[in-house]
A protein has these predicted regions:
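Acidic/polar low-complexity surface segments
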Residues: 121-139, 143-147, 263-272, 317-327, ...
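Beta-propeller domains
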Residues: 235, 242, 250-256, 260-312, ...
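N-terminal adaptor/linker regions at the entrance to substrate-recognition repeat cores
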Residues: 2-266, 520-521
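Leucine-rich repeat
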Residues: 11, 39-42, 67-78, 81-88, 161-170, 173-179, 192-227, ...
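Leucine-rich solenoid repeat modules
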Residues: 76, 342-521
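Concave beta-strand-loop units of leucine-rich repeat
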Residues: 91-95, 182-187, 229-236, 258-265, ...
Length: 521
């Protein structure tokens, strides 16, 4: 029997089953199908307009839109198609009002109809079943209110447990999601451990990861997820743990991760360690941007040794609460990236937002990067002893200070494949020697002897920027004016056949902040 010979009732049911992905192509295939499916087309267009790009309402004290995950769960229960239309989910409320959100959550959950709707979703969830979770217990936990004398369940980062439960349920319902911005409360996600609250949440997150990873481009939730976008401002006091992103890292469709303010440091004090959760799995990440983060060499090692396809990595260092990474081991940080991503990385940026102490070891060689075309580096990443020297600088219990004149020439550091180089004089540091940046720059561009041959045949651009450090502009130019002295042949720039561009061009992280509207506190 031909399709158009089917009874109208059956054809109507077939059209309904094409929602949302295939409706447009099917409905427009012929007049008969379009005529039967006219109401579906109208509903489809309304759903696309309303739900393709979902974000919480941020307009203060209004009753327009949704401000809590509980409200969205109720809407999805009443109209399950909503979940299939959401392709971008922005759960971050930048003008977050915790008291207002708490009142709204309470109002939603005090309504018996809403409670029944959320309970219905929980009861239908095969994710909860596979995680051996009791839907009734989840509903009770989501309705829990912290009383006087109760201990917060989220350790030292506040109590947003029930909101994170609701968000996790949302993450089980979004098969067509492409871009995700996590909510404010995600920083309160408990670290994975054996405590009942942590096991309760992470058991479901593990099922989400497994289903999305094993069933790409299927109806599994998050199986089409491609980008994780920033969900926090850069802050000294507030810290997002890199482990919060563990559920998304192994999902094969996730190729881009742009995040801010994450910590991956095991210092036994104020750091938050990062451990790769999904043993035996690797990430399919291609592009990774870590803005205003606080990660040591061990933390970055634990991450990048599981990213075999990474082509772009950009990192800016930011000291966190109580001086976490006050001194930073830049040399071993870059060496770890080189060891694990040297054969794939094409673009690398390592810059410094804030450094109250010293660079413990400096970058002395990047020869292990086999495909690196573009590099953007803060001048200070070179201002320390080589990682293999056994020497370390530090402001705490360490009197050693590296002789900046021993910083290798830039030509000895860069790999043969390099095409573009951007170096930045930082706008502010805590180092007692205010001239250390300029001394480092002078060492990097010192003269070469006539007999020496440079090994960067494809280099076409060398850029030296001073960002907001305008006071350094004249000093930077003087360094290159000295090198441009015609009485000194074979200077580095002549050998490279390029002239340095000296401007106030923005660093990658400044562009990042503008693009994603990220602020510093």
């Amino acid at each position: 029997m031909l399709l158009l010979e089917l009874p109208v009732e059956l054809l109507d049911k077939i059209i309904e089953l094409t929602l949302p992905d295939s409706l447009e192509s099917f409905a427009l295939s012929c007049k008969t199908v379009y005529s039967v499916g006219r109401d579906y087309v109208r509903s489809h267009n309304l759903h696309k307009q309303r739900w393709t790009c979902f974000r919480y309402d941020n307009r203060g004290n209004t009753d327009h839109g949704f401000k809590t995950p509980m409200e969205l769960l109720v809407a999805i229960y009443e109209d399950p198609l909503i979940a299939s239309y959401i392709q971008t989910a922005d759960f971050w409320q930048k003008d977050y009002n915790e008291e207002q959100i708490a009142r709204l959550k309470k109002r939603v959950l005090e309504d018996d109809t809403n409670l029944a709707a959320i309970g219905g979703l929980l009861g239908q969830s095969h994710y909860l079943r596979h995680a051996n979770q009791d839907p009734e217990q989840w509903l009770a936990e989501m309705c829990w209110e912290e009383g006087e004398g109760d201990e917060p369940r989220d350790a030292y980062r506040g109590d947003h447990y029930s909101t994170n439960m609701a968000t996790i349920i949302l993450l089980t319902l979004l098969p067509n999601l492409r871009e995700l911005i996590l909510p404010n409360e995600w920083l309160s996600l408990p670290e994975p451990n054996d405590s009942p609250p942590a096991k309760q949440l992470w058991s479901v997150l593990d099922v989400i990861t497994c289903e999305a990873g094993l069933r790409p481009l299927s109806n599994a939730s998050l199986s089409r997820l491609n980008k994780i976008l920033p969900y926090a401002h850069v802050s000294y006091r507030d810290r997002n743990a890199l482990i919060e992103l563990n559920p998304f890292l192994p999902i094969k469709s996730v190729e881009h991760m742009h995040i801010a303010n994450c910590v991956a440091v095991d210092d036994g004090h104020t750091g938050i360690p990062f451990t790769w959760r999904n043993t035996g799995q690797t990430s399919n990440l291609r592009i990774l941007e870590l803005a205003g983060c606080c990660i040591d060499s061990d933390g970055i090692t634990e991450l990048v040794k599981h990213t075999p396809h990474l082509t772009t990595l950009k990192y800016s260092h930011h000291v966190k609460w109580h001086g976490c990474q006050y001194d930073w081991d830049a040399g071993n940080f870059v060496r770890a990236i080189e060891e694990h991503c040297g054969s794939t990385l094409e673009n690398l940026a390592v810059t410094i937002d804030s450094l109250d102490g010293m660079v413990e070891t400096g970058v002395d060689s990047m020869q292990g990067f086999q495909r690196l075309h573009s590099v953007e580096l803060d001048i200070l990443v070179f201002a320390g002893p080589p990682p293999g020297s056994g020497l370390r600088q530090g402001t705490i219990d360490n009197g050693y200070k590296y002789d900046i004149s021993k910083v290798p020439c830039l030509a000895d550091i860069l790999p043969r494949s390099i095409k573009q180089v951007s170096l930045f004089v930082p706008s502010s540091t805590g180092d007692a020697d205010a001239g250390i940046e300029l001394q480092t720059l002078a060492s990097l561009f010192r003269q070469y002897a006539p007999s020496e041959t440079l090994g960067q045949p494809d280099l076409v651009e060398v850029h030296v920027g001073f960002g907001h450090a305008y006071a350094y502009a004249d000093e930077v130019r003087q360094i290159f004016d000295a090198h441009n002295d015609s009485s000194k042949p074979n200077r580095l720039m002549d050998k490279w056949h390029v002239d340095p561009t000296i401007t106030d061009r923005k660093t990658w992280v400044e562009d990042f902040h503008e693009k994603y509207a990220i602020s510093y506190d």
